[in-house]
Amino acid sequence: MKTCKFILLFVLLVSCWNCAEPELGFEEKVLPDAELNFLPENIRVMDLLAPGYLDAWGDATFTILNNSIGNKLLRYVKALSPNRAFIRFEAIPGEDGLPDMAYAGSGLIRYTGKVLNNDCKDELLFHEFFHVFQNGIERPPRKSVNNELEACLAQYLYSDSKSSSYFAVVIDRDFRPILVALASCIDKRTGYLKEGISYDEFHEKYVAALDFIAKTPPYNGSDWMRDQAGYNEHPFPKLVQLLNQHL
């Protein structure tokens, strides 16, 4: 019996040692396959969007469903309400300093008329779907600068996966090179850092992106939290959950 206990302890110690990745600054985790088994399959637009949606939103959702990353995201979104379509849309007047789209909680996405004329409206909608994934439907969305950056990064990776020469502006045009620099550190297959990228390099670009958003309206408001991840912590857990599935 003592011999068995010793062997078991040795195996556990070796497993823990192998999981550690000091270069990344945080531990990589492969999510269990069991989690995937609970996600809905073969989702249709009508399974997500409550009746009465505009064709523009139905078409944009269809585009997202037919993209690898987008399909993964919408499977997670659907899992929040397996038995009914719960995503609703509400048109609002445009106001200076406010986003043209925003997730208001409880499955409600608000938008201005300007968005309907955007050729990349699926990317903007993907962004809001990601906020649904982050926040769920049981409580109001958190006003977190870190969450906004994570959604921007997810949107960029979705846009990049389409191999299109057109892309929706994220925050503003000056932010794009900062976002691209941060995205260049991320392994699209896992959500963790690419091989050869040091945590210090990643962290520097992460803070620069966070700083940019934090000074930009409306994210510079007193009701917004910075939520900066601690050093050696991964700041984008939902992005890792989305990408690290190998579906």
Show where each model-derived region lies.
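Bacterial Sec-dependent N-terminal signal peptides
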Residues: 16-46, 241, 245-247
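Auxiliary, metal-adjacent structural segments of Zn-dependent hydrolase domains
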Residues: 23-25, 41-109, 114, 118
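Pan-zinc metallopeptidase signature
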Residues: 187-247
